[in-house]
């Protein structure tokens, strides 16, 4: 099968670029002092410490967003080039953390979240090569918790470093330790923190399977390590569970009827488990018959119901979970008529409706709204390419993979686009966000962070109290203008 038939997924994604992007080696990092006129992040608002944000659903609680956009879009605060990677960063404590690759080094870079000024970096060697010709950089977003940053590289190296200065605290080579056969696009499921545990999608295999090539992936079996939990402070193994292989959806954690649950959309279907022990409640088979297929959209949990979706075959299903099992509320029928077929971009639930990009390819993707409890299609809008969403203040910030940024009203009545813009460099008129722009936008303390193939752009989505438009800053990842 040609690689063009398999759009790269990360989720995690999510978040992507093309091989050869970025800089082989940036200049030696030099901190930059900023004048007082440069925008600073508002004291109000929330951090965005992990993939899909603090509530794990790509929804922001911040309000007062700019809805009347000028022709050039919301004000650009700062921007910088990126290395090779697919993921968007994370924001905590006034710092922005970005995970990229430069040459043969995977690198975490810490920047001032409001100015883009370089603070420090941490790196480690990597020789990962993608089977399908997509880029060789990280797919996962950094996870920040309790003064630590967790990194999960494309080759399966798991690192924990200090969020203050990048010093190494512990590391585990999950591919070597658990016998992971390289997946279609490498490792792309961002870990999650649960109490004292770091829960990681691993999906290892017994020794007799480890020489299988990518064309024999259906012959690869699990060794019971679909879900692996480590002590988040020490890196010690706490448990391994699940007879499944890894895919690209991020584990989802939720409280259902007073009990903590974990949901992992693995290669062959959805696993419901107890996150503190790894005890498995159920496995719901849900995978396309296509050999080169993945499950990449993170499960969406509302009350005691869990929504899953994929784009290669069966489509979507809604389950009602209970200890030891589940009931199917609805699922897409066989054939072509599917409610939602999200690829890597996780849909967002809002007031009884689900909004997301449905479609396997750029050309056939639609932005859709469906009814949560029935799957009924409320509206669809073509031509937006595969898009990623962020909910804030009654609207969706919608980033198409072609780099087009839109503001869409969150309503089931019809598609209502309030603004549409292609962000451009003021001096060259070149697009700031080049295709593919596969990472979902993030919002933290009024600042909107977006990435395209090789550039990170920070916008002021929520105006400062004084309403003053701040000057642009164009930086490199080492902090130089």
What kind of feature is each model-predicted range?
Residues 1-4:
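Positively charged n-region of N-terminal signal peptides that target proteins for export
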Residues 8-19:
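Bacterial N-terminal signal peptides
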Residues 21-481:
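Noncatalytic, solvent-exposed loop/strand surfaces
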């Amino acid at each position: 099968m040609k690689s063009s038939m398999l759009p790269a997924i990360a989720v995690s994604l999510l978040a992507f670029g093309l091989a050869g992007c970025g800089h082989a080696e940036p200049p030696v990092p030099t901190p930059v002092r900023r004048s007082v006129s440069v925008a600073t992040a508002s004291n109000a608002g929330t951090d965005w410490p992990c993939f899909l944000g603090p509530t794990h659903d790509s929804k922001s609680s911040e309000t007062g967003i700019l809805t009347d956009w000028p022709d050039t879009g919301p004000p650009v605060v700062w921007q910088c080039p990126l290395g090779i990677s697919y993921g968007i960063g994370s924001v905590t404590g006034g710092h922005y953390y970005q995970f990229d690759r430069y040459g043969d080094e995977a690198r975490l870079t810490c920047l001032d979240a409001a100015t883009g000024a370089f603070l420090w970096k941490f790196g480690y060697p990597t020789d990962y090569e993608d089977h399908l010709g997509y880029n060789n950089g990280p797919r996962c977003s950094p996870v920040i918790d309790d003064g630590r940053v967790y990194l999960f590289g494309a080759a399966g190296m798991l690192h924990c470093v200090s969020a203050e200065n990048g010093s190494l605290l512990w590391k585990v080579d999950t591919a070597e330790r658990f016998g992971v056969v390289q997946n279609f696009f490498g490792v792309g499921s961002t870990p999650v923190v649960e109490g004292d545990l770091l829960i990681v999608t691993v999906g290892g295999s017994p020794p007799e399977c480890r020489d299988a090539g990518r064309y024999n992936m259906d012959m690869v079996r699990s060794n019971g390590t679909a879900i692996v939990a480590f002590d988040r402070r020490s890196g010690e193994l706490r448990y391994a569970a699940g007879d499944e292989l890894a895919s690209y959806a991020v584990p989802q954690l939720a409280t259902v009827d007073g009990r903590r649950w974990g949901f992992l959309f693995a290669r062959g279907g959805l696993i419901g488990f107890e996150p503190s022990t790894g005890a498995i409640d159920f496995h719901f088979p849900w995978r396309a018959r296509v050999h080169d297929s993945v499950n990449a959209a993170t499960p969406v949990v509302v009350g005691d119901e869990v929504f899953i979706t994929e784009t290669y075959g069966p489509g979507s299903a809604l389950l009602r979970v209970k200890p030891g099992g589940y009931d199917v509320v609805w699922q897409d029928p066989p054939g072509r008529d599917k409610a939602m077929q999200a690829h890597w971009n996780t849909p967002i639930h809002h007031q009884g409706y689900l909004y997301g990009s449905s479609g396997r390819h750029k050309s056939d993707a639609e932005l859709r709204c469906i009814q949560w409890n029935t799957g009924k299609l409320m509206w669809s809008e073509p031509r937006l390419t595969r898009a990623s969403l962020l909910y804030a203040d009654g609207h969706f910030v919608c980033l198409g993979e072609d780099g087009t940024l839109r503001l869409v009203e969150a309503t089931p009545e019809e598609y209502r686009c309030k603004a549409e813009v292609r962000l451009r460099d003021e001096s060259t008129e070149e697009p700031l966000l080049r295709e593919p722009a596969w990472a979902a936008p993030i919002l933290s303390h009024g600042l909107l962070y977006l990435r395209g193939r090789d550039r990170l752009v920070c916008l002021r989505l929520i105006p400062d109290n004084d309403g003053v438009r701040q000057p642009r800053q164009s930086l490199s990842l080492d902090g130089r203008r």
